[in-house]
Every structure is written in structure tokens, then in C-alpha cells.
Amino acid sequence: MVVALTGLSLGLGFYHLSSRSLWLDEGYTWLTAAQNVKGITAIAASQGYHLLPYYLLIHVLIGWFGDSAFVMRAPSVIAGAAAVPLMYLLAARLAGRRVGLYATVLLAVSQPLVFWQQNARDYAFVVLLAVASTLAAVVGIQDGSLGPLIGWALIMAVGCYTHPEMLLLVIPQELVMFLWSGSRRVRVGIVGLTMVGALLNLPVLLNAVHSSVYQTTPLLPPGVGSATEIATFLASGAGTAVPVTATDHALLGITFALAVIGVAMLGADLVDRGCNRSNLGLGLGLAWLVLPPVISWLVSESGHPDFLDRYLILSLPAASLVIALVLGRVQPRSLGLFGLVYLLIFRFGVLAPSYSAPLDDFSTATADLLAAARPGDCVTIASNQARTLYDYYSARLARSAGGRLTQPVQVLPFAVNGSPQVVLAFNDLPLGDYRNAQQPQFVAQAATGCRRIWLFQSHVGSPTGSATSQLFYRSLLTLERNLQLYFRPAGQFNYHGVAVSLFDRDRRPG
């Protein structure tokens, strides 16, 4: 049965794997992994070393098999599927085979897991490492052995270099290990391993504090809205790529009710018997589910916003574990099984529509632009981030067309299409320098050589967002005003997360 569920996870992950366009962050995966090892390490160092192991893996695969979306996404599918049997081992060790199967099937059909399995980012690996580290911690607690705890420490070290939010899992894991372990030797070992782990992860901690990623992340401070989004996400609701529906709200309500029942069960057990083997599962699951979001909220309030659903995917397996533990205690057993089936119907109802929804449809936007382009056309990219995937798709389309496709010249600033090294140079260009290249005098120069200019924009901020988001938005408005000094708007085309505007010199004002 576990093999079948692992196969189900692989099938759900590989289904239509390449049909959804790469989105902004996946473009950065391609951009980074396409560099040499020295370049990858330098980029990772500037961002707290997070994703370094992941980028190196994708770098090897690109070298072997090319840079298609399938190649870059396949490792995430496999990582997410690998978490499924580990979830069974964890839940079965805590509460028996039936609960193990419940937790396994719930995780396998979790929409957020499947969605991020189909992304060329590290989030599925975070789920795998979260489950693996928790399993090692449980074995160490139950067996009173230091060997599994050493494994736990090593997994957490790799996890922190994969994504720094894995640090949020340390506190709930150590809290449970201290409270539920009856071995003084294990507790002393935990303290020692924590000190060693802190030294191993010191580069992550120091760079994360000073990294520009955390200083310029365009996230607002946490609030009720973002908390609801994260709660829906952890309940395996949609919302990342598709609008939240009544099904998502129902799924959140059911999951929340089961979690509350779990809290009541744990409280009663602790009053009657204290921390023991029988309630370890609920104690661990609830701490794993609740504490990382709470800690993330507090960190975000300190000025380093990271209160975002996908950053907390490390707690996603905990929801499946808690639900399985609660349903496993329901009597008669048929009632618990009915509850599982009822919940799975909602999860499949959320999962099915999410396959067709891209986060950013760079693929279609770029293809349509190139299909409509004429000789003498130019294109300007509204932000350096959007340039990455425009170059990725335009270069691939040009290769497949065998030179028969018109490639507009990139202007404001001028750039060469398709080279990851060139794109990286623009991606690192400060916003102020980028805006200077789009001032009226440079637009005037472009007007002498461009009959039409396509404005390609994505993630250009918001007038009501964070300070960084507002800065990007004002930059876009300035660019549009400058273009209209010499060109007349001739069309607007909107896609998921991407917009393309056409400006025509032959129909300029006056």
C-alpha cells in the first residue's frame, strides 16, 4: 500500500509536469544553476547560502540533460514522493500501521505538496527533510539512542543550507525531545548537537540576517489575511495559483476542527499521564504544526518579513500527521475511516483544478510577443527580474524555429538575448541604475532605431504594497510616461502574472 501511495505521489507530480510555464523564482533557478560552480557558490553566499545544495544538483542535471522545465522540475517530484514512505514510517512508529496509512495518503494528495513538486524550487526537498529529521528525532526519543539524534542533526544541517526556514523546525523538535525523552543522556546529547549544529549553520544565520533578500522582500507585515492564507495552505487548500473557493474554506474548517480535537485529546492525556509514548505523536504533531508559523510571525514583526505560505511548507506534513492521529483514535474505526474518505474528497476537489493554473505565464506571453513581432521591433523589460524568463523562453523559441523567428532587439537597457551570464548581470543591476537606462534621453535614442517597442512586465509592484513594491510600481509608471513621449500605446495583452504592451512610433503623439 505504501508503494502504491508513493507511486500515486510520483504520478500526481509528473502529470502535466511541463505544461505550466516556469514562473519568476523558477527562472532564478535556471539563471543560477546555469552558472559554473564558482558562480553558483558566489550567488548562494550573497543569499545566506540557502538553496546551495539544490542549485548544485540542478546544475549537474542541466549539464547532463539540458535546461528544459521537465529536467529542472523532476527532482522536486522525486523529493516530494520520497517524503511519502518516510511519513508512513514516522506515523506508524508513533501510532501504528493504520494511522501510518492515513497520514501517508493525506500527504500524498496534498495540493500544496503536489503544486510545489511541480516547481523547480527547493520546497519539496524541504518537506522531505522535515519528515526525515522528525523521524530521526522520534527514533532517538523512543530508543534513547544518540545515533538517530546525530542523524537528526546532520539532516537539519543539510536542511538549513537548503532553505533557512528549516531553522523554524529546530525549536518544536527540541522542545518535544526534551519533554518526551526520559533519558538524561539523550537530553545532554541534544544540547551538544545543537551547539555543533549552530556552528555548522553559522554562515546561514549570519548571511540570512544581512542578506538583501530579507531586506527587500516585498512582503507586508503579517496580519489576519496572511495568517488565513497560511492556515488554508497547511490545511492543503489551494490559493497559491488559483483563487480560494468554498471548498478550500470547508477544508480549512474541517482541518481546524480536527486540530482542536487533537489539542483537547493531548491536554487530557497530559493531565492524566504526563508526557509518555502514547501521546508523543500528538505532542510532536501539534508543536510541528503550530510553532513554526508562530515563530515566523514573530521574526517577520522584527523587520525581516518571511511570513509566506510556501516558506512554511515544512509544517505541511504535520497537518496530515495530526489529522491521522485524531482519526485513528475515533471509535468505531469505521467512523474514522469515513472521516478520512470525506476529507480526501475535499482534497482531490482542491487538487484537480490547480494543474491548469500557472503562477506567471511567461511561456505564452513570450510566444505571443515573438509571433506578433515585426522586423524593426524592439522590446524593453520593465524590471530586471522579468528579463530572466523572457530570455529563457525567447531563446528556446528561436532555437526551435531555426532562425525563422523575429527577435526584437532588447533596449532600455540594451541587452543580448538568451545568455544566462548576460541576464545575471542585469539581474544584479541596482534598481536605480536600471531606471536611469529608461530615462527620456535613452527612450529618444531608442525611438530612432525602433519602429515599435514592446513593454514586457511582470512583478512590477503595487501602489499599496510594501515600500519596495511601491518603488517598483513607480518605476513602471515612469517608464510608461517616457515611452509615450515618442510612441503611442497600440495594445495591451494580459496573462497570469505577466502583461505585454505595444507602443508604435508611427502613431506617436502629434
Where are these regions (language model features)?
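Membrane-proximal helix-loop-helix interfaces that form the catalytic/acceptor-binding platform
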Residues: 2-509
